[in-house]
Amino acid sequence: AFGSADRVFIMSSWHDLNSEETFHTLDTELDGLTEQEVQKRRSRYGMNKLKEPEKTSSILRFLSQYHDPLNYLLITAAIVALLIHPEQPGDAIFIFIVLTANATFGFWQEGQAEQAMDALKQMSVSTCVVIREGIEWSIPTPDLVPGDVVKLDEGLNVPADIRVVESYQCKVDESSLTGESNSILKSTDALPSSTLLADRNNMAYMGTCVSTGRAIGIVVETGMSTELGRI
């Protein structure tokens, strides 16, 4: 069985295990988990869902753009300048205009980033095909647990972080996660532990999409433990 200590150790190292080691570490096999084991793992690791962060009001998000020591210093300088020379407010006004322009730009950038992240999270699929006790099932994606064996087919989004153990000309579009414009051909070979995320061609990550081919893989991370969940 794989306990909490094992899980912490291998969270960032799934790509450097070969297929046999991955099966062994997750205490699973190509026929998949039993329903009893699925229930145990769901109790331990929870549902395969991304938590929605608490939404901050637009006003608070805008005001937070001023939360910087340099901004505090400039605001103080502007106020002092107004108090000392109220008849010459030009410098103070200029400082306030610059601060407001910077805050507005930061607020806009933050909003764009939130929209992009929301769009990325919407790419998680609602159902997926899993093999349990040698039988293929179509199940809700939130029901996946570490150790589940999942089939990936062309046009489907990847439902969790998955270590690929069989690949049939499978290419995955990872642009939403890594920025790589070309689809990545997946393989099953182990990679050095230092391999960067964008170069881990034996992994398929939640929120990416199978562009061609098909594959079989083992769920290694779910929910907030996925690369997408950690963003």
Residue ranges and their predicted role:
Residues 2-231:
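Conserved cytosolic headpiece of P-type ATPases
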